[in-house]
Amino acid sequence: IIGDTINGAITTADNIAGKIGII
């Protein structure tokens, strides 16, 4: 499902950014 893939990628990127301290 394209929508799930895009949402998953955004969530993963947000989690990584949060761990680094960007967000």
Swiss-Prot record:
Intrachain disulfide bonds: none
Main location: secreted
Superkingdom of the organism of origin: Eukaryota
Localization of this protein: Secreted
Gene Ontology cellular component terms for the protein in this record: extracellular region
Family: Belongs to the Frog skin active peptide (FSAP) family. Septenin subfamily.
Function: May act as an antimicrobial peptide.
Protein name from the UniProt record: Septenin 2
Organism: Osteopilus septentrionalis (Cuban treefrog)
Source taxonomy: Eukaryota, Metazoa, Chordata, Craniata, Vertebrata
